């Protein structure tokens, strides 16, 4: 086939515009084609239907994300650290903490019992007491309207929604919630019972590693249709912590479910067999997910009135008399299954059994169960009467500090300002001795801080005095100089040695300077100076009887002198006894620039390269030119 001829820009534009017009004005055919391409809106049919699941929230997202990581990194070693994989949850937690709608209207009685009757406007939370809970803690009130998302009120049936405590003596104006617990819940998966279908994605739970995914409830007495997972109920991947014999709140992530201050989370206040059975189920299985209830908050103390105090003390006493006291069987047996499974750094393991619970009576006469058989980091014990004070050495966190200690990994909360808690964010301080009472002034102010300040001032003053004494001691001492090897240097001896060395160097330089100038020349110059001085002392007119002049004329040798041989013989006889070096006595040698006489063995042959002769010729010509120029300059005078 022949290639199509190339189109010009004008033809291409014309075809483009004509095609557009045809598409626009092509009639019903073009319209039908375009309508076929449009997606049909969702109707009653099954093909075009689009299902919008409004129930999917932060819980489902948080469940799905760690599952993928678990499946991929299931066999990798686990590092004990806080992994924030749920940004939406953190956002909702922050919104919940900063919200002004979360208030506690109930109070605690004088006997130390707490009422969980504050309203809960927070999103659902779950607390697993055998695995770390990374969700923020929430408080639940069961005698006031609960505007939170729907929850199931039955505690003896599987509940796939977050459990809540329910007060059955007041109406619940919250949104309707499911009443049947044997049907699947399309809401985000929370607790999982293996006798009901599990709509959540399959996940693995390893027994030897902490579960960083959102905690699930697992019933081990029924078959599990979901993929197999492993659950550890008492593994504590946190670092070992020293035991606190007098504290029940030594870790911010520990939940004591047997302590009176924290009755079983989310358990109801109707003292019916159903509630007792629910508590027994919690104690026996050890895996039921219950949401932690905060029993006291700063808002409670700020907003409760005197009337509310009086109104709620009676229910607290009634609750203590109806079987929720320290001797209640369900609470006493619940201490067996208090397991500390947080993800805090490794701690030292206690020497005692891990499941041993310690009971102590606080200052108000309330039983506290301090199951400190965990592996949290070592803290300093506060041995004063406050057994529920904050005595940990971990970074300060905002959290309630009553008998209910947290066993989750949720973000820090505000500290409750009770009488026995330290509500500031300063580093931990040393606790006073148990038998020592803090000193007070008559005005009631403590004197410990003043004493500490005075002690600091005294220490600083002592340091300054020591420094001053040290400076005065070595003020007039000489400086010790040392060489590289560390030996002391004597500067005086070094200066003397340097002076002697300088003198030696100067003498050697003078000697080399004489040798460089020439010894014979220097002696000849010295002789000439002496002769000149001697001639200067003579009178200006010299006569014929001058002895020096007569001797000089007699010693001269002249050619053709008949008496020359006779004179030589006489000199030889005279100098015979004297040791004189032999000297050249032949024909006159050619001159040289140093005027050196040849040796007595020279045979009279000039063996030089003629440099001396050329030099003298150049000097003679230069002198001749100067004389000629001078004569030309004075010729006209």
Swiss-Prot record:
Q: What is its main location?
A: nucleus
Report which superkingdom the organism of origin falls in.
Eukaryota
UniProt-annotated stretches for the region Disordered: 18-53, 104-470, 553-595
Which ranges form a coiled coil? 490-538
Instruction: Return the Basic and acidic residues bias intervals.
Output: 108-119, 295-315, 353-362, 453-465
Phosphotyrosine is carried by which residues? 512
User: Compositional bias of type Polar residues: which residue ranges?
Assistant: 260-275, 318-335
Residues modified as Phosphoserine are 135, 148, 161, 174, 187, 213, 226, 238, 259, 264, 272, 284-285, 297, 341, 344, 371, 373, 376, 410, 426, 585
Its keywords, alphabetically, are: Coiled coil, Isopeptide bond, mRNA processing, mRNA splicing, Nucleus, Phosphoprotein, Spliceosome, Ubl conjugation
GO terms (BP aspect)? mRNA splicing, via spliceosome
Q: Where is the composition biased (Basic residues)?
A: 430-439
Cross-link Glycyl lysine isopeptide (Lys-Gly) (interchain with G-Cter in SUMO2) residue location(s): 65
Pfam families assigned: Bud13
Q: Where in the cell is it found?
A: Nucleus
Task: Extract the signal peptide range.
Answer: none
Q: Which residues carry this modification: Phosphothreonine?
A: 131, 144, 157, 170, 183, 196, 209, 222
- GO annotation, cellular component aspect: nucleoplasm; nucleus; U2-type precatalytic spliceosome
Q: Which family does it belong to?
A: Belongs to the CWC26 family.
**Known function:** Involved in pre-mRNA splicing as component of the activated spliceosome. As a component of the minor spliceosome, involved in the splicing of U12-type introns in pre-mRNAs.
Subunit-level organization: Part of the activated spliceosome B/catalytic step 1 spliceosome, one of the forms of the spliceosome which has a well-formed active site but still cannot catalyze the branching reaction and is composed of at least 52 proteins, the U2, U5 and U6 snRNAs and the pre-mRNA. Component of the minor spliceosome, which splices U12-type introns.
- Name of this protein: BUD13 homolog
The gene it comes from is Bud13
